[in-house]
Amino acid sequence: MKYLNQQEAISIDEELFNEYKFSVDQLMELAGLSCAHVIADAYAPESNKILICCGPGNNGGDGLVAARHLALMNYNPYVYYPKRTEKELFRNLQHQAESMGITVTTDCPDGASVEQEFGLIVDALFGFSFKPPVRDSFLPIMNVLQRSKLPIVSIDIPSGWNVEEGPQNECDIQPACLISLTAPKLCAKRLLNAQHYLGGRFVPKRLEEKYSLELPSYLGSNLFVKLN
């Protein structure tokens, strides 16, 4: 199976949109749904809430979709979404989550309350377009994630990591689980003792062959594959 560099990941996304005529909301819904299924496979529902940290881009959109589906699966998601966008897609995703009774807040939770109130953290802050360093407005939540003892599930890229080189310093988060989308990125080779899943079951065979992705086979109707 091929691990993608940043430009390859961007190019594949562009081909999905332009050559194969997928819409952003189509792929986001499929990606977020697969993330919810991975979390349901790896972590049983608990009384504690799931803190889902969403960034301003498509990675954050995946998190908003996952929150909605997790609520339908009897989990208790709580969304931290500090930097909003005026794009209709993201406004709709937020509205859908809130309409289902999910709290979506701009208030950064403090470390102590996170440890007391939550049982799991989903990191949907930055995707494969990210280039360090982390912007100042996201430093508070990154500090919470770096210090937390709770398991962290990262969507596609552990936030703060270089997409190709992985963690840049010893303070970067180390997720307990990574959900790679479409295909793993090079940074996934730097995971330490983490569960690794592949989600996003939407890659056309012709596109897979063009980039020599050699994706693993999905079992039956599953939306994910466990890679380790």
From Swiss-Prot:
Q: List the disulfide bonds.
A: none
Q: Which UniProt keywords apply?
A: Isomerase, Metal-binding, NAD, NADP, Nucleotide-binding, Potassium
Query: What is the E.C. number?
Result: 5.1.99.6
User: Which stretch is the leader sequence?
Assistant: none
| Organism taxonomic ancestry | Eukaryota, Metazoa, Ecdysozoa, Arthropoda, Hexapoda
Q: In which family does this protein belong, per the annotation?
A: Belongs to the NnrE/AIBP family.
Any one GO MF term held by the record is:
nucleotide binding
Q: How is the cofactor bound?
A: Binds 1 potassium ion per subunit.
| Any one of the GO CC terms | mitochondrion
Name the coenzymes or cofactors required. K(+)
Q: Which residues are involved in binding K(+)? A: 59, 123, 159
What this protein is reported to do is described as:
Catalyzes the epimerization of the S- and R-forms of NAD(P)HX, a damaged form of NAD(P)H that is a result of enzymatic or heat-dependent hydration. This is a prerequisite for the S-specific NAD(P)H-hydrate dehydratase to allow the repair of both epimers of NAD(P)HX.
* Top EC class of this enzyme: isomerase
**HAMAP family per the record?**
NADHX_epimerase
| One Pfam family named in its UniProt record | YjeF_N
| Catalytic activities | (6R)-NADHX = (6S)-NADHX; (6R)-NADPHX = (6S)-NADPHX
Q: Which InterPro entries match?
A: YjeF_N_dom, YjeF_N_dom_sf, YJEFN_prot_NAXE-like
Give start and end of each YjeF N-terminal domain. Answer: 9-215
The protein here is known as NAD(P)H-hydrate epimerase
